[in-house]
A protein has these predicted regions:
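Macrodomain-like recognition of ADP-ribose-binding/processing modules
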Residues: 1-175
Length: 175
């Protein structure tokens, strides 16, 4: 969302004050854009990259908000200022749990959509990680596996691990 939107409207749309998030559940929300179409990216004979809108494939986009304890802007209206969480900055366990809550929300939304292939980003593992970056990157695959293996969901045949709802779960690479 643009920083040019007045603060009261931003607050109404977000409905979460992440600067005061002292519990992981503050990050347990997912926003879904269903029935989206993505296009293939191609290279023309001149080496220019372009989107080939004739080659589209359906997808659903799921967005989550992970904790920010590493980036803070200079202005009060800055997105990073409005999301910086000093509690998570001081407490790795809270930060990790917030990341896990965001991943949980996203994976549950994807399972409810019937998503076959879940493509996961490293939530909060870049500039938002701050001093926790190395530890989170080392823990990230374990966090995903904990959710896929240990989270039990109701199914017609009884409880099943969340991971059974997907054909594949792909964790993107960080560079």
């Amino acid at each position: 969302m643009s920083d040019t939107v007045p603060a009261p409207l931003r607050l109404r749309l977000c409905q979460v004050d992440y600067t005061r998030a002292d519990q992981p559940w503050f990050y347990g929300h997912a926003w879904v854009v269903g029935d989206a179409a993505l296009s293939a990216k191609r290279t023309d004979s001149y080496g220019q990259r372009f989107y080939d809108v004739d080659v589209r494939y359906p997808t659903s986009l799921v967005f989550v908000a992970g904790p920010n304890c590493g980036a803070r802007g200079h202005e009060a209206s800055s997105t990073t200022t409005r999301t910086f969480n000093p509690h998570a900055a001081a407490n790795y366990a809270l930060f990790r749990s917030g990341v896990k809550a965001a991943l949980y929300a996203g994976l549950m939304a994807m399972a409810q959509l019937g998503t076959e292939v879940a493509l996961l980003a490293h939530i909060s593992a870049g500039i938002y990680a701050g001093t926790h970056k190395a530890k989170l990157r080392a823990d990230f695959e374990d966090i995903v596996n904990e959710l896929l293996e240990d989270t039990m969901c109701d199914s017609p045949s009884g409880p099943a691990p969340l991971g059974r709802y997907f054909h594949r779960v792909i964790l993107t690479l960080l560079e």
